């Protein structure tokens, strides 16, 4: 087993539809018994969310185990603090097996928080949550403005879930001295970003991929989720592709609008992901059409 100071992990991050899964599978094929994959995806973490999340199929998942895919069901809610806790434990276990963790995905906030750390915030207060649920969203936002104006400025006045959580955190005094949870500072982190040189190249890839995500199978999947789980206020309601599917089922949009709205939302997601990448420090960026260069880079960096 490597000494702690020599431990290396890999980040492979990039916008949607850039072939990140194909890259790590190729690496696993070319360097057997070397890497273990940790998924960094806030939707693929959930069981039953398969079509709309672009989750690798069962055959791929059986052959190449992905940690943190199908990790919990929609009766539960995942967040960045749980991701950091789960991932740091996984990384230690992977090192114990003598392998290299490779974190791959497009949930940039998870990557960033793992690197930079977050405050060890208090858990939810059930009694307080029940009290707050009695208010409508406008009243809740007024409460937040009165109790913590600075926080209210950064939150959409219609985002009920975030408003409630902000009030909870403020009342639980998260601003007192708290430990910061993050990656071990002694780890060597090799960060690889995939980004298009031309936006049109990514839009083309999105257009090719989107019919496989936004189709009748997605509608059936969304209907199944609504029947199986209580998800009225679950974050999955806002996830790209699922949001549009739920809107279609509930009559908020029609069939002719559905596909175009998923396509637009996916492009907007990719735009936000690229914005993250452009401001990322210590990131080795590769064009989406230069996948072979990533392997050459890793061979050199890891001395494979």
Predicted regions mapped to residue ranges:
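Phosphate/pyrophosphate-binding catalytic cores of soluble transferases and nucleic-acid-acting enzymes
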Residues: 1-304
């Amino acid at each position: 087993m490597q000494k702690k100071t020599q431990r290396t992990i890999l980040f492979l991050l990039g916008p949607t539809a850039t072939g990140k899964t194909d890259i790590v599978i190729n690496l696993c094929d070319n360097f057997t018994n070397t890497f273990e994959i940790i998924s960094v995806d806030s939707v693929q973490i959930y069981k039953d969310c398969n079509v709309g999340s672009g989750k690798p199929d069962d055959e791929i998942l059986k052959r190449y185990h992905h940690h943190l895919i199908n990790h919990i069901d929609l009766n539960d809610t995942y967040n960045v603090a749980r991701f950091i806790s789960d991932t740091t434990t996984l990384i230690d276990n992977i090192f114990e097996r003598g392998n290299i963790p490779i974190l791959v995905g497009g949930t940039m906030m998870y990557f960033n928080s793992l690197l930079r750390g977050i405050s060890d915030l208090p858990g939810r207060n059930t009694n307080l949550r029940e009290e707050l649920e009695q208010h409508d969203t406008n009243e809740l936002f007024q409460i937040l403005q009165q109790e913590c104006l600075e926080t209210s400025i950064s939150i959409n006045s219609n985002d009920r879930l975030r408003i409630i959580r902000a009030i909870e955190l403020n009342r639980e005094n998260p601003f007192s001295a708290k430990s910061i949870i993050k990656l071990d500072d002694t780890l060597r982190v090799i960060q690889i970003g995939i980004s298009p040189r031309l936006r049109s190249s990514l839009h083309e890839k999105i257009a090719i991929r989107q019919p496989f995500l936004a189709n009748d199978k997605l509608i059936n999947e969304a209907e199944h989720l609504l029947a199986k789980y209580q998800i009225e206020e679950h974050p999955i309601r806002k996830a790209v592709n699922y949001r549009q599917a739920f809107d279609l089922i509930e009559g908020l949009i029609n069939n002719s609008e559905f596909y175009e709205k998923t396509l637009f939302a996916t492009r907007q997601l990719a735009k936000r992901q690229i914005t993250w990448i452009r401001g990322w420090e210590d990131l080795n960026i590769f064009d989406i059409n230069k996948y072979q260069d990533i392997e050459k880079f890793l061979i050199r960096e890891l001395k494979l």
